[in-house]
Protein backbone atom coordinates (compact mmCIF):
# COMPACT_ATOMS: atom_id res chain seq x y z
CA UNK A 1 0.00 0.00 0.00
CA UNK A 2 0.99 3.62 -0.41
CA UNK A 3 2.45 5.50 2.55
CA UNK A 4 -0.10 6.93 4.96
CA UNK A 5 1.81 9.73 6.72
CA UNK A 6 0.14 11.60 9.55
CA UNK A 7 1.39 15.14 10.03
CA UNK A 8 -0.94 18.05 10.84
CA UNK A 9 0.72 20.29 8.27
CA UNK A 10 1.13 17.74 5.49
CA UNK A 11 0.08 18.02 1.86
CA UNK A 12 -0.86 14.46 0.93
CA UNK A 13 -0.62 13.88 -2.81
CA UNK A 14 0.61 10.28 -2.85
CA UNK A 15 -2.37 7.90 -2.82
CA UNK A 16 -4.86 9.41 -5.29
CA UNK A 17 -7.45 10.22 -2.67
CA UNK A 18 -10.10 12.83 -3.35
CA UNK A 19 -9.21 16.13 -1.62
CA UNK A 20 -12.87 16.97 -1.04
CA UNK A 21 -15.28 15.40 1.48
CA UNK A 22 -17.97 12.89 0.51
CA UNK A 23 -21.45 14.05 -0.48
CA UNK A 24 -23.29 15.79 2.39
CA UNK A 25 -25.89 13.03 2.40
CA UNK A 26 -23.21 10.61 3.62
CA UNK A 27 -22.85 12.44 6.94
CA UNK A 28 -26.63 12.51 7.30
CA UNK A 29 -26.91 8.78 6.62
CA UNK A 30 -24.27 7.97 9.24
CA UNK A 31 -25.92 10.27 11.78
CA UNK A 32 -29.33 8.68 11.19
CA UNK A 33 -28.11 5.09 11.36
CA UNK A 34 -29.65 3.27 14.30
CA UNK A 35 -26.98 2.08 16.71
CA UNK A 36 -29.31 -0.77 17.66
CA UNK A 37 -29.07 -2.08 14.08
CA UNK A 38 -25.38 -2.83 14.60
CA UNK A 39 -26.24 -5.88 16.70
CA UNK A 40 -27.57 -7.51 13.51
CA UNK A 41 -25.53 -9.01 10.70
CA UNK A 42 -25.53 -6.90 7.54
CA UNK A 43 -27.27 -7.97 4.36
CA UNK A 44 -24.91 -10.49 2.71
CA UNK A 45 -26.05 -9.58 -0.81
CA UNK A 46 -25.85 -5.83 -0.10
CA UNK A 47 -29.20 -5.34 -1.83
CA UNK A 48 -29.75 -1.66 -0.89
CA UNK A 49 -26.34 -0.57 -2.12
CA UNK A 50 -26.44 -2.76 -5.21
CA UNK A 51 -29.90 -1.41 -6.06
CA UNK A 52 -28.62 2.16 -5.75
CA UNK A 53 -25.64 1.34 -7.99
CA UNK A 54 -27.87 -0.42 -10.53
CA UNK A 55 -30.24 2.55 -10.64
CA UNK A 56 -27.39 5.04 -11.05
CA UNK A 57 -25.80 3.16 -13.95
CA UNK A 58 -28.99 1.95 -15.59
CA UNK A 59 -28.35 -1.78 -15.20
CA UNK A 60 -30.22 -4.62 -13.52
CA UNK A 61 -29.72 -5.48 -9.87
CA UNK A 62 -28.48 -8.96 -10.77
CA UNK A 63 -25.66 -7.36 -12.79
CA UNK A 64 -24.01 -5.76 -9.73
CA UNK A 65 -21.50 -7.23 -7.27
CA UNK A 66 -20.13 -5.17 -4.37
CA UNK A 67 -17.05 -5.64 -2.23
CA UNK A 68 -14.80 -3.96 0.31
CA UNK A 69 -13.09 -1.64 -2.15
CA UNK A 70 -12.28 -2.44 -5.76
CA UNK A 71 -9.19 -4.32 -4.51
CA UNK A 72 -11.52 -6.83 -2.87
CA UNK A 73 -13.66 -7.06 -6.00
CA UNK A 74 -10.65 -7.50 -8.29
CA UNK A 75 -9.09 -10.12 -6.03
CA UNK A 76 -12.37 -12.04 -6.04
CA UNK A 77 -12.46 -11.83 -9.85
CA UNK A 78 -8.89 -13.16 -10.08
CA UNK A 79 -9.71 -16.02 -7.74
CA UNK A 80 -12.98 -16.87 -9.49
CA UNK A 81 -12.17 -16.56 -13.18
CA UNK A 82 -8.40 -16.75 -13.70
CA UNK A 83 -7.91 -20.48 -13.16
CA UNK A 84 -6.52 -21.59 -16.51
CA UNK A 85 -3.00 -22.88 -17.10
CA UNK A 86 -2.73 -20.17 -19.73
CA UNK A 87 -1.23 -16.86 -18.59
CA UNK A 88 -3.37 -13.83 -17.96
CA UNK A 89 -2.25 -10.59 -19.63
CA UNK A 90 -1.83 -7.13 -18.13
CA UNK A 91 0.48 -4.14 -18.83
CA UNK A 92 4.02 -3.96 -17.49
CA UNK A 93 3.39 -0.50 -16.05
CA UNK A 94 0.07 -0.74 -14.27
CA UNK A 95 -1.66 -1.26 -10.95
CA UNK A 96 0.79 -3.04 -8.68
CA UNK A 97 -1.69 -5.49 -7.19
CA UNK A 98 -2.16 -7.46 -10.44
CA UNK A 99 1.13 -9.40 -10.16
CA UNK A 100 0.69 -9.70 -6.38
CA UNK A 101 -2.68 -11.42 -6.73
CA UNK A 102 -1.39 -13.55 -9.59
CA UNK A 103 1.47 -14.87 -7.49
CA UNK A 104 -0.68 -15.27 -4.38
CA UNK A 105 -3.29 -17.32 -6.26
CA UNK A 106 -0.64 -19.08 -8.40
CA UNK A 107 -2.03 -17.65 -11.63
CA UNK A 108 0.42 -17.62 -14.56
CA UNK A 109 0.78 -14.17 -16.08
CA UNK A 110 2.56 -12.16 -18.76
CA UNK A 111 3.25 -8.46 -18.57
CA UNK A 112 2.67 -6.75 -21.92
CA UNK A 113 5.01 -3.78 -22.37
CA UNK A 114 3.48 -0.38 -22.92
CA UNK A 115 5.08 1.45 -25.84
CA UNK A 116 7.62 4.26 -25.46
CA UNK A 117 4.77 6.73 -24.84
CA UNK A 118 3.37 4.46 -22.09
CA UNK A 119 0.40 3.52 -24.28
CA UNK A 120 -1.20 0.08 -24.25
CA UNK A 121 -0.67 -1.82 -27.52
CA UNK A 122 -3.96 -3.60 -28.14
CA UNK A 123 -2.49 -6.15 -30.57
CA UNK A 124 -0.40 -7.58 -27.72
CA UNK A 125 -3.63 -8.87 -26.20
CA UNK A 126 -4.78 -10.87 -29.23
CA UNK A 127 -2.68 -13.94 -28.38
CA UNK A 128 -4.09 -16.94 -26.55
CA UNK A 129 -4.46 -16.25 -22.83
CA UNK A 130 -6.22 -17.18 -19.61
CA UNK A 131 -7.76 -13.75 -19.09
CA UNK A 132 -7.07 -10.04 -19.45
CA UNK A 133 -7.10 -7.17 -16.96
CA UNK A 134 -6.06 -3.53 -17.28
CA UNK A 135 -7.05 -0.17 -15.82
CA UNK A 136 -8.67 2.51 -17.94
CA UNK A 137 -7.42 5.16 -17.49
CA UNK A 138 -4.21 3.35 -16.69
CA UNK A 139 -2.43 3.76 -13.38
CA UNK A 140 0.11 5.19 -12.82
CA UNK A 141 0.26 6.82 -16.26
CA UNK A 142 -3.26 8.28 -16.45
CA UNK A 143 -3.58 7.45 -20.15
CA UNK A 144 -7.05 6.43 -21.32
CA UNK A 145 -7.72 3.82 -23.99
CA UNK A 146 -10.59 4.40 -26.41
CA UNK A 147 -13.77 2.35 -26.26
CA UNK A 148 -13.07 1.18 -29.82
CA UNK A 149 -9.66 -0.20 -28.84
CA UNK A 150 -11.07 -1.94 -25.78
CA UNK A 151 -13.84 -3.45 -27.87
CA UNK A 152 -11.22 -4.78 -30.29
CA UNK A 153 -9.52 -6.54 -27.39
CA UNK A 154 -12.80 -8.03 -26.22
CA UNK A 155 -13.71 -9.20 -29.72
CA UNK A 156 -10.34 -10.94 -30.12
CA UNK A 157 -10.84 -12.80 -26.82
CA UNK A 158 -14.31 -14.39 -26.89
CA UNK A 159 -13.18 -17.26 -24.64
CA UNK A 160 -11.43 -15.12 -22.02
CA UNK A 161 -12.73 -12.95 -19.22
CA UNK A 162 -11.76 -9.32 -19.86
CA UNK A 163 -11.72 -7.10 -16.77
CA UNK A 164 -11.58 -3.33 -17.26
CA UNK A 165 -10.58 -1.62 -14.03
CA UNK A 166 -12.27 1.80 -14.19
CA UNK A 167 -11.17 3.16 -10.82
CA UNK A 168 -10.44 6.56 -12.39
CA UNK A 169 -12.99 6.67 -15.21
CA UNK A 170 -15.00 9.58 -13.79
CA UNK A 171 -12.03 11.92 -14.29
CA UNK A 172 -11.65 11.24 -18.03
CA UNK A 173 -11.94 8.67 -20.76
CA UNK A 174 -15.16 6.86 -21.62
CA UNK A 175 -16.57 3.93 -19.69
CA UNK A 176 -17.18 0.61 -21.44
CA UNK A 177 -20.25 -0.09 -19.31
CA UNK A 178 -22.48 0.20 -22.43
CA UNK A 179 -20.68 -2.90 -23.79
CA UNK A 180 -21.75 -5.10 -20.85
CA UNK A 181 -24.91 -6.35 -22.54
CA UNK A 182 -23.07 -6.90 -25.82
CA UNK A 183 -20.23 -9.08 -24.49
CA UNK A 184 -20.84 -11.74 -21.86
CA UNK A 185 -17.11 -12.01 -21.05
CA UNK A 186 -16.70 -8.37 -19.94
CA UNK A 187 -16.46 -7.29 -16.30
CA UNK A 188 -16.23 -3.59 -15.42
CA UNK A 189 -14.90 -2.72 -11.95
CA UNK A 190 -15.23 0.69 -10.30
CA UNK A 191 -14.71 2.19 -6.85
CA UNK A 192 -16.09 4.79 -4.45
CA UNK A 193 -12.56 5.64 -3.28
CA UNK A 194 -11.68 8.22 -5.93
CA UNK A 195 -14.46 10.33 -7.44
CA UNK A 196 -16.85 9.72 -4.52
CA UNK A 197 -14.32 10.59 -1.78
CA UNK A 198 -14.88 7.40 0.21
CA UNK A 199 -11.50 5.65 0.35
CA UNK A 200 -11.96 5.30 4.10
CA UNK A 201 -15.22 3.37 3.69
CA UNK A 202 -13.90 0.77 1.21
CA UNK A 203 -16.58 0.27 -1.43
CA UNK A 204 -15.97 -1.22 -4.86
CA UNK A 205 -18.24 -2.91 -7.33
CA UNK A 206 -18.32 -4.94 -10.52
CA UNK A 207 -20.94 -4.79 -13.26
CA UNK A 208 -21.25 -7.69 -15.68
CA UNK A 209 -23.77 -10.19 -16.98
CA UNK A 210 -25.89 -11.94 -14.32
CA UNK A 211 -24.20 -15.31 -14.80
CA UNK A 212 -20.73 -13.98 -13.97
CA UNK A 213 -22.11 -11.99 -11.03
CA UNK A 214 -23.78 -15.13 -9.68
CA UNK A 215 -20.49 -17.02 -9.81
CA UNK A 216 -18.70 -14.14 -8.07
CA UNK A 217 -21.24 -14.24 -5.24
CA UNK A 218 -20.81 -18.01 -4.92
CA UNK A 219 -17.07 -17.53 -4.51
CA UNK A 220 -17.53 -14.69 -2.03
CA UNK A 221 -19.98 -16.66 0.12
CA UNK A 222 -17.52 -19.54 0.35
CA UNK A 223 -15.15 -17.20 2.22
CA UNK A 224 -17.27 -14.66 4.09
CA UNK A 225 -20.93 -13.84 3.56
CA UNK A 226 -20.78 -10.56 5.51
CA UNK A 227 -17.97 -8.56 3.97
CA UNK A 228 -19.60 -5.11 4.05
CA UNK A 229 -20.73 -3.55 7.32
CA UNK A 230 -23.93 -1.62 7.95
CA UNK A 231 -22.31 1.81 8.22
CA UNK A 232 -20.56 1.37 4.89
CA UNK A 233 -23.76 0.23 3.18
CA UNK A 234 -25.68 3.26 4.51
CA UNK A 235 -22.93 5.67 3.47
CA UNK A 236 -22.61 4.07 0.05
CA UNK A 237 -26.32 4.35 -0.70
CA UNK A 238 -26.22 8.03 0.24
CA UNK A 239 -23.11 8.72 -1.83
CA UNK A 240 -24.33 7.11 -5.02
CA UNK A 241 -27.64 8.98 -4.89
CA UNK A 242 -26.06 12.44 -5.24
CA UNK A 243 -25.15 12.76 -8.92
CA UNK A 244 -24.86 16.55 -8.79
CA UNK A 245 -22.24 16.49 -6.02
CA UNK A 246 -20.22 13.85 -7.88
CA UNK A 247 -20.20 15.93 -11.05
CA UNK A 248 -19.30 19.11 -9.15
CA UNK A 249 -16.39 17.50 -7.32
CA UNK A 250 -15.02 15.81 -10.43
CA UNK A 251 -15.22 19.08 -12.38
CA UNK A 252 -13.14 20.86 -9.73
CA UNK A 253 -10.47 18.15 -9.78
CA UNK A 254 -10.32 18.10 -13.58
CA UNK A 255 -9.96 21.90 -13.69
CA UNK A 256 -7.13 21.74 -11.14
CA UNK A 257 -5.49 18.93 -13.10
CA UNK A 258 -5.50 20.89 -16.35
CA UNK A 259 -4.04 23.92 -14.59
CA UNK A 260 -1.39 21.70 -12.98
CA UNK A 261 -0.35 20.45 -16.41
CA UNK A 262 0.36 24.02 -17.51
CA UNK A 263 2.21 25.02 -14.34
CA UNK A 264 4.37 21.89 -14.16
CA UNK A 265 5.14 22.01 -17.89
CA UNK A 266 6.39 25.58 -17.45
CA UNK A 267 8.78 24.23 -14.80
CA UNK A 268 10.14 21.69 -17.27
CA UNK A 269 8.20 18.60 -16.20
CA UNK A 270 7.11 16.11 -18.83
CA UNK A 271 4.15 13.76 -18.48
CA UNK A 272 1.59 11.80 -20.48
CA UNK A 273 -1.78 13.45 -21.03
CA UNK A 274 -3.46 12.16 -17.88
CA UNK A 275 -7.21 11.64 -17.84
CA UNK A 276 -7.17 10.73 -14.16
CA UNK A 277 -6.79 12.53 -10.83
CA UNK A 278 -2.99 12.42 -10.93
CA UNK A 279 -0.02 13.25 -13.15
CA UNK A 280 2.84 10.87 -13.97
CA UNK A 281 5.68 13.37 -14.19
CA UNK A 282 9.40 13.36 -14.90
CA UNK A 283 11.94 16.18 -15.07
CA UNK A 284 14.99 16.12 -17.38
CA UNK A 285 17.25 17.93 -14.90
CA UNK A 286 16.28 16.43 -11.55
CA UNK A 287 15.85 12.82 -10.53
CA UNK A 288 12.50 11.67 -9.26
CA UNK A 289 14.12 10.44 -6.07
CA UNK A 290 15.75 13.81 -5.44
CA UNK A 291 12.46 15.67 -5.83
CA UNK A 292 10.57 13.10 -3.79
CA UNK A 293 13.00 13.41 -0.88
CA UNK A 294 13.01 17.20 -1.06
CA UNK A 295 9.21 17.36 -0.97
CA UNK A 296 8.99 14.74 1.77
CA UNK A 297 11.22 16.86 4.03
CA UNK A 298 8.60 19.59 3.74
CA UNK A 299 5.76 17.15 4.45
CA UNK A 300 4.59 17.25 0.85
CA UNK A 301 4.02 13.63 -0.08
CA UNK A 302 3.96 12.35 -3.68
CA UNK A 303 4.40 8.78 -4.93
CA UNK A 304 7.86 7.57 -5.92
CA UNK A 305 8.11 4.02 -7.26
CA UNK A 306 11.86 3.83 -7.73
CA UNK A 307 12.12 0.76 -9.96
CA UNK A 308 11.94 -0.28 -13.59
CA UNK A 309 10.39 2.01 -16.16
CA UNK A 310 8.82 4.18 -13.45
CA UNK A 311 12.03 5.02 -11.57
CA UNK A 312 12.37 8.47 -13.15
CA UNK A 313 8.74 9.44 -12.51
CA UNK A 314 6.66 10.86 -9.70
CA UNK A 315 2.94 10.26 -9.49
CA UNK A 316 1.36 13.45 -8.20
CA UNK A 317 -2.22 13.28 -6.98
CA UNK A 318 -4.35 16.30 -7.84
CA UNK A 319 -5.26 18.04 -4.59
CA UNK A 320 -7.12 21.24 -3.87
CA UNK A 321 -5.91 24.41 -5.55
CA UNK A 322 -4.33 25.45 -2.24
CA UNK A 323 -2.48 22.14 -1.87
CA UNK A 324 -1.20 22.35 -5.42
CA UNK A 325 0.04 25.91 -4.88
CA UNK A 326 2.05 24.63 -1.90
CA UNK A 327 3.58 21.99 -4.17
CA UNK A 328 4.38 24.53 -6.91
CA UNK A 329 6.01 26.90 -4.40
CA UNK A 330 8.25 24.15 -3.02
CA UNK A 331 9.33 23.09 -6.50
CA UNK A 332 10.00 26.67 -7.66
CA UNK A 333 12.07 27.40 -4.56
CA UNK A 334 14.15 24.27 -5.12
CA UNK A 335 14.72 24.97 -8.81
CA UNK A 336 15.73 28.59 -8.12
CA UNK A 337 18.38 27.83 -5.50
Residue ranges, per PLM feature:
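Phosphate-binding glycine-rich loop
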Residues: 37-38, 47-87, 285
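PLP-dependent aminotransferase class I/II
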Residues: 23, 45, 185-265, 269-272
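Active-site pre-lysine segment of PLP-dependent enzymes
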Residues: 119-128, 140-162, 166-198, 210-212
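N-terminal "arm"/small-domain region of PLP-dependent enzymes with the aminotransferase-like
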Residues: 1-40, 119, 128
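PLP-dependent enzyme catalytic core of the Aspartate aminotransferase-like
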Residues: 148, 294-303, 307-337
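PLP-dependent aminotransferase-like
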Residues: 80-135
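Conserved PLP-binding catalytic core of the aspartate aminotransferase-like
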Residues: 253-254, 266-298, 314
Amino acid sequence: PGDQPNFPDMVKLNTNENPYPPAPAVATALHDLSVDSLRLYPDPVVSKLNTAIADFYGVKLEQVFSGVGSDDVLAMCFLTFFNSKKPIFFPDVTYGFYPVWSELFQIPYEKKPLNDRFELVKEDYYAENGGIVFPNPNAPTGIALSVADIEDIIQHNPDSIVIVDEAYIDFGGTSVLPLIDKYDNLIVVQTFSKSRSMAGMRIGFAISNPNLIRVLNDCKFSFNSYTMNQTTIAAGVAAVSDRAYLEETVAKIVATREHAKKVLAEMGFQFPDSQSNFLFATHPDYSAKELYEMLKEQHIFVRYFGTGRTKDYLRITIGTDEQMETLYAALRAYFQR
